[in-house]
Amino acid sequence: MEAKYLTYFKVENFKRFDSLEVSDIGQFNLVVGDNNVGKTSFLEALLFDEENLGNFLSNLNSVLANRKILGLNNDFTIVDLFAKDPKVSMKYFFQYLNYPEQSELKVSKRLRSSLQTEEIDTVSTKLKLYPDLQFIEFSLGTNKYYIFPGELKLITGYYPYIPFTTIYGNDIVDFFSRLAISSSWLENFKTNLREFIPNLITVELSNAITKESIIVLREQDKDLAQPLAQYGDGTIKLFRYLLELEFCENRRLMIDEIDTGIHYSRLKDFLKKVLQTARNKNVQIFATTHSKECLEYYKQALEDLGLQDSGRVIKIADTKSGIKSFTFNFAQFDNALFAGSEIR
């Protein structure tokens, strides 16, 4: 499967954005900007999936669940909860590397009572199955698709977004158990983890401590296996990122505050491991940071790996004419860092 890297993205009427346009996007994109300017909202906007619209809605519903916000029912739709103006459609414009044409996806809230006769014929089965008062209409090119909130109960899928609060959880137990079936994968995974745990022998699942299986690590000179949850945030984050990159192969992964919990002395090696794994798996990364140290180590990691052409810094700023984005290629943000210019 060919990797799909966004090179251009524009979203309209999404959360606080009337319109946010981002161009010259790279494979690796570090997103910076002031607090509450919309960095996290930008990551959430990137959860669109024009190839699987049900998964797209499920992704946004996962955002709500993660934030402990009311999910979808027959009185609410994604447009109500994510659109700046729920009466207006959300619009996505996007272009992929090696795909010359720009595409548009429109997401609109519709009332059940607004269906025309020909539309009723199209969704007659869904009307019988779901009592929802409202539904979502997707317009992609000349095609239209309809999804009712009740359908989301049947949709389960991987959610390619890592909130900054997410560290250890049952999901990575599931991720690991599915991947560790492969001995070659497990050996490579352990090699990557030894960047942070030099004495690591192996990683395995155990239910000796709790009824549910947990991830434990065995190290040299330690008789007992240690639960992953007892390790530091940096180790657990690397563990999670390496797993999630596997599930995002040939797609994109959004990471909020990628450097939080990572000691500065480990940050460059941490970023190198994440970037190299993403390169190997053809994953496009969008990650936020507030840290100037992270910018500097990101630059050094790209240099060490020879990936300067793939790196970008995207700044989101609240200007007099609204929220805008500014993309810096490697040479531009390298010069800005050298000159001491503030680009965060």
Please give the residue ranges for each predicted region.
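Phosphate-coordinating catalytic segments in nucleotide- and nucleic-acid-processing enzymes
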Residues: 2-3, 8, 50-246, 252, ...
